[in-house]
Amino acid sequence: MSLTIAVVGRPNVGKSTLFNRLVGQKLALVCDKPGVTRDRRIHAAELQDLCFDVIDTAGLEEAGDHTLEGRMCSHTKAAINEADLILFMFDAKSGITPSDLNFASLVRKSGKPIVLVANKSESKAAVGVEYEAWSLGLGEPCPISAEHGLGLSDLRDAIMDAIGKERVFESKNAEKCVSVQSASVGDYVDDLEEKGSVCDESKQPLRIAVAGRPNTGKSTLINRMLGQDRLLTGPEAGLTRDSISVDWEWRGRHIKLFDTAGLRRKSKIQEKLEKLSVADTLRAIRFAEVVVIVFDATAPFEKQDLQIADLVIREGRVPIIAFNKWDLIENNSQVTLANLHEKCAHLLPQVPGLRAVPLSGQYGQGIDNLMENVMMMHRMWNRRISTAKLNRWLETIVAHHPPPAIFGRRLKVKYITQVKTRPPGFVISCSRPKTMPQSYLRYLSNGLRNTFDMPGVPIRISLRASDNPFAARSKKK
């Protein structure tokens, strides 16, 4: 059983900065503005020879249960219940506040081992605050600077003293420590793509990002999938800020779900924090294999919906549209759905055969249908076609509709091979590739989809000039 440590405290004391320091990556958004973190995030961490799971939490604030701050506080309390040890953090530069005193009492009632952490202790204003910190009743404070990485050795010793050496090293093993030192998101994706078919896909978690405009029900959908209120939800638009990953299992398949911040139009994004959230969402989309684009069924196909779908297609991820809030459609007949499918084909012609499913995240209707489509599309996205089959297909399709003549000379399409999967990528050898019309490339791309049963999958085709066997002879002359 792994050791779990929760980092808690009032807003803007540096919890997310310490979280990033412990996991060795900038996973959590960090900003001077208080209340940046809203959902709890868990990740494998390492502190010298200690391996554990660390939970970043929202700042504790005094508020009613039904307010946004109150709901955030309830998620932090859930993290306290999940943890084996609590790091209670306060701002040494600001000193002890009445809020610190109130929340210290809350943490003490949990009965969990607690380490009092005095962050920002590098500041001159922090001198003497350790005496004041005794008023919290949590023992001697451990001074650190999460931003500069100071005092982490003392923090490691404090954790050991609080929970005991036997408990700390109970679950330590080589595999976990190696996993903490894993590559960044981008390196991991590149590594998987280089391995291609050598990597056993069934043993890797399927990465699914849930994206869309603000307030389309992304977090509600994921909560329904998990069967618990894991993510913060509410009527307010733009609740999610960080891209939160959660583990899930569907019919025996391990899945990693990514909840993302809603993407607004670029012209409306002014604040630094929202820009950071958007960048985090874009990273999650690039890291994912399948992206479920959540449309509000009561107001589908807004301009921003189409731009998000186009972004996913350009990134080469598997796009699947989910018409959420289907329970609010009065006439949810097959005719309505057929009309929406027709609009999909008309407004998103980049990928013919795009999958679109109706569902209700609030009531759980249509989730199995969504996941069946996800699994099917993921298999297509990973498909590899033999060169012999491809060239037989190419010969047939070119004979049926030859390339056009450019400046009186007909283009010659000679050879095709698949060079990658995820998404499927093909190289075609032809004469004068720079003059190949885009319309003929679309013809070849759609032909590939139809013949090899890959509807709704982004396909990339590159053209390469064929070798001229007489080029060397002409140079000799």
UniProtKB/Swiss-Prot annotation:
Keyword GTP-binding included in the entry's annotation: yes
Residue intervals of the EngA-type G domain: 3-167, 206-382
Domain named KH-like: residues: 383-467
Gene Ontology MF terms: GTP binding
CDD domains hit by this protein: EngA1 (cd01894), EngA2 (cd01895)
Keyword Glycoprotein belongs to the record: no
Binding positions (GTP 1): 9-16, 56-60, 119-122
GO biological process, one term: ribosome biogenesis
UniProt entry keywords in alphabetical sequence: GTP-binding, Nucleotide-binding, Repeat, Ribosome biogenesis
Pfam family, one: KH_dom-like
SUPFAM superfamilies referenced in this protein's UniProt entry, alphabetically: P-loop containing nucleoside triphosphate hydrolases
Positions with a binding annotation for GTP 2: 212-219, 259-263, 324-327
Assembly and interaction partners: Associates with the 50S ribosomal subunit.
Similarity remark: Belongs to the TRAFAC class TrmE-Era-EngA-EngB-Septin-like GTPase superfamily. EngA (Der) GTPase family.
Function: GTPase that plays an essential role in the late steps of ribosome biogenesis.
Name this polypeptide is given: GTPase Der
Organism: Bartonella quintana (strain Toulouse)
